[in-house]
């Protein structure tokens, strides 16, 4: 926010420069100009976070209703897992915000996994997937949990074999891809990716405010947005309409053996150690858990962590610096985050073949 000179100083300046009675008019004009500039700044900030009008789909895997229908069936089908009891929707449950509500995911044989299940909303705009960014497309990501030994524990060959044994899948694949031998690993992942790209957050109160409806959010949330984009520094990483930069940062959480993005860097490169992808704040769960491994159980704990600046180490993001926040400011920031929640869209479960 721009600094504004005290009124007496402004009046004295105006009297020297312009003289006499015109001074008051000049000061009034300066105040108006400052207010106009502030409104322009706010409008520019709103534009940065305004939701897009359409959903992107890659040319190599274009959107079709038939492909979405097939991908939806595959997403909810437990036959894609070795046990035959776990589907993608088991962990990415639409009733739980397309996650599972657990501190950490549970994998094959009910073995706890080291990371929390991320929601699958708004992935159409993503550029890197998984907490460590090891997948560069949704098509590549769709294969990973299926073939991971500690997740669904399947091979794509076995997936294809099982699907070919289900008579009802042949017409679904043929309608989606139109080839003589449509049931194949590439088509499985393409359909799953296409369906996931259709999972988009609904319009939230913040969106209506960003479009000009001043009554859509309260004064506390508006102050919270000013904190989010200003003093608190949240928008440095939680940017764009999805409130994520899709990048990777070490935010100073208590470290274990999980190096995150650093796993893919040479040992001599420390910058990416303990760096994980910035999660979206859209439809943020207000009851936790939070962070890539669910180690912070409440929003209050998250705020405390950022206020303290995280654990100091060479890889700590330069954005992580201690700062002070009053109780009112904390409430305002939470009030803003609550405006990012939309009413969950109703989803009809597919009739599996």
Curated annotation (Swiss-Prot):
It is an enzyme of class 1 (oxidoreductase). Heme c 2 binds at residues 234, 237-238. It holds the Pfam family CCP_MauG. Heme c 1 binds at residues 88, 91-92, 292. Binds 2 heme c groups covalently per subunit. GO terms for cellular component: periplasmic space. Residues 1-23 form the signal peptide. GO terms for biological process: methylamine metabolic process. GO terms for molecular function: calcium ion binding; cytochrome-c peroxidase activity; electron transfer activity; heme binding. Pathway: One-carbon metabolism; methylamine degradation. InterPro entries: Cyt_c-like_dom (IPR009056), Cyt_c-like_dom_sf (IPR036909), Cytochrome_c_Peroxidase/MauG (IPR051395), Di-haem_cyt_c_peroxidsae (IPR004852), MauG/Cytc_peroxidase (IPR026259), Methylamine_utilis_MauG (IPR022394). Its EC number is 1.-.-.-. PROSITE patterns: CYTC. It is found in: Periplasm. Involved in methylamine metabolism. Essential for the maturation of the beta subunit of MADH, presumably via a step in the biosynthesis of tryptophan tryptophylquinone (TTQ), the cofactor of MADH. This is Methylamine utilization protein MauG. It comes from Methylorubrum extorquens (strain ATCC 14718 / DSM 1338 / JCM 2805 / NCIMB 9133 / AM1) (Methylobacterium extorquens). The lineage of its organism: Bacteria, Pseudomonadati, Pseudomonadota, Alphaproteobacteria, Hyphomicrobiales.
